[in-house]
A protein has these predicted regions:
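Residues at secondary-structure transition points
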Residues: 1-4, 46-53, 99
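Short, mixed-charge, low-aromatic patches
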Residues: 11-20, 43-46, 61-65, 87
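A beta-strand edge to alpha-helix "cap/lid" segment located at domain peripheries
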Residues: 2, 60-132
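Short, flexible micro-motifs
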Residues: 23, 42, 100
Length: 132
């Protein structure tokens, strides 16, 4: 796929967060895909390396916190070859009325029109604070 097509695919992927679309997110990932989030897993349950299969429960748990989903605002997006890098921020309201606004740098690797690797850098302590 071209860099332009890869960037479009990543924008589409991020748009599914707004709808709480775990199924759609997983469908866009390759069967052997992995997703890594910075942080210490014993302090932040979403941290560490997860397989696509493990991401089902992670995404279900994430979307269960919110009234609708998370709006992902893309601030910058750069692509080269099979890699797309995104700087973004999220906006959402939890079911308990807390505002969730986090910052991200996410590195995507794509293969054959599917996302095969996600490396997400975010503020895990903000997530812990809001989701408790």
């Amino acid at each position: 796929m071209s860099v332009t097509a890869n960037k479009h695919l990543v924008r589409c992927f991020l748009s599914h967060f707004e709808k709480g679309g775990a199924n759609e997110l997983l469908e866009m990932m390759g069967d052997d895909a992995t997703w890594w989030v910075n942080g210490k897993p014993h302090l932040f349950a979403f941290a560490g390396l997860k397989t696509k299969a493990e991401m089902r429960s992670v995404l279900d748990e994430l979307f269960a916190f919110f009234n609708v989903g998370l709006q992902m605002e893309v601030r910058s997006l750069i692509g080269e070859g099979d890699i797309v890098a995104v700087e973004a921020c999220s906006h959402g309201v939890t079911k308990h009325g807390k505002r969730y606004e986090n910052e991200y740098h996410i590195l995507f690797r794509l293969r054959d029109g599917k996302i095969v690797d996600v490396r997400e850098y975010t503020d895990p302590m903000h997530a812990v604070e809001v989701m408790q």
